[in-house]
Amino acid sequence: MNPRIRAAAAVAPQLQADMDPSAESIAGVDEVGRGCWFGPVFAGAVVLTEVAAVELLAEGLTDSKALTVRRRARLVPLIEDAATAWALGQASAREIDALGIRSATELAMLRALQRLPTPLELVLVDGVLPLRLWMGPQRTVVRGDSKCAAIAAASVLAKQARDGLIKRLASRFYGYGLERHVGYGTAIHRRALLDLGPTELHRRSFLTKLFAVNGSLT
């Protein structure tokens, strides 16, 4: 056996500990971009067999936040090929402002899950809060993106898709540094907002405090 696969197989039971062994179709779901000032929040949903999980772990699958851009990009096609099913969902900045970030995040997760072609026996949700919009069986997994291969895979797909979208939008919204911070609240982003004002894709509900101190939100 390949040493990487042997090592991954040794830790796979721990990483999959939150899965129901009697269930055959389990999806991991995770969000990306919850704290950003700009653009949509994304969610990924992935169904993996145990064999696929072990193979992906051997390739270095882990929480997307712990991966370099290059390693994450390399994992994306591997996840897409290995997964029984995968899908993405998103909720727009306008929906975030209208619904609030938690409800909008849940909407993105629901959209991802509804796009899966596979009927689900269980959904594993990253974090401590349940997915209120999902009517089927579910289980929350604290720090699930570092404990469950399906959730980690979902986070990688969502992160790669969202970051790619924001970087493509950087040329349309020039001057905000989106290609560098992909919408997060950095000093460069803050300065650009104060100089240029928010765009149509900024989350105005996130900027209220910034502009309350520094001027009008127009």
UniProtKB/Swiss-Prot annotation:
UniProt superkingdom: Bacteria
Enzyme class: hydrolase
Cofactor note: Manganese or magnesium. Binds 1 divalent metal ion per monomer in the absence of substrate. May bind a second metal ion after substrate binding.
Alphabetic keyword roster: Cytoplasm, Endonuclease, Hydrolase, Manganese, Metal-binding, Nuclease
One biological process term in Gene Ontology: DNA replication, removal of RNA primer
GO molecular function, one term: RNA binding
Entry EC no(s): 3.1.26.4
Pfam family, one: RNase_HII
Subcellular location as annotated: Cytoplasm
CDD domains tied to this protein: RNase_HII_bacteria_HII_like
Residues where a divalent metal cation binds: D30, E31, D126
Reaction catalysed by this enzyme: Endonucleolytic cleavage to 5'-phosphomonoester
Domain annotation RNase H type-2: ranges: 24-218
One cellular component (GO) term of this entry: cytoplasm
Main location: cytoplasm
Cofactor(s) needed by this chain: Mn(2+); Mg(2+)
Biological function: Endonuclease that specifically degrades the RNA of RNA-DNA hybrids.
Family: Belongs to the RNase HII family.
This protein's name: Ribonuclease HII
Organism: Prochlorococcus marinus (strain MIT 9313)
